[in-house]
């Protein structure tokens, strides 16, 4: 998987000088899926760049063209003032659009309960990244991303409990119109709404929220019988077995990219 990651980064950056990845097969799996999506968006005409952790873009002529994957325990977004040697992300803009988006790996999102939930791969408005990097401390965004992908590089097949846990996580992250007075919610610029940008319209109910976002569980080994029973109602996309060379691998990259090109501004 790592050679494929390096190839995708080379195509986006114009040859990376170094790839600093986190330890563990599961983290490599996340990075593989993340970079495949970014590179596919590039082939479809999107303007795709790597952002350093201080928010600066990596240009082909830069001496420092490394990509850093977040290691250690999950966190929120670190302040840009902490420097450029923390986790990298991707920024992209669709053809003929003025709106930028960011692709994150392993960021903690804050829910209505006040608890945090790690999303393996998330796509959020660029404005959210700018705001969080401007803070003096590590901060989690509040709400759910436009795209949420859970990556499972494990031997056993996915269970119904795994699916329930993902649905529950998304439920806590969903900000509905009736939740404006929930005490844990932060300032408006730190929240993520389905219509932001350009608007701030909140979801009316969880069912709607799931259909105005893209939510995927990608597994190397697929799913056990009964694990996907609730996916249709909750609009969760189960994909597996996803690993290099499989039909599901190519389908996942294409389906996520199709959704982005069709649904994001």
For every predicted segment, state its role.
Residues 128-129, 138-237:
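Acidic, metal/cofactor-coordinating or nucleic-acid-engaging core segments within structured domains
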Residues 24, 28, 32, 116, ...:
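Short, well-structured alpha-helical interface segments that form or flank functional binding sites
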Residues 1-13:
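N-terminal hydrophobic or amphipathic helices/low-complexity stretches enriched
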Residues 244-265:
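C-terminal helix of von Willebrand factor
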Residues 58-144, 156-157:
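Active-site metal-binding core of divalent-cation-utilizing nuclease and nuclease-like domains
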Residues 14, 18, 22-76, 80-84:
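Nuclease catalytic cores
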Residues 36, 118, 165-169:
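Alpha-helical scaffold elements adjacent to nucleotide-binding pockets in ATP/GTP-utilizing enzyme cores
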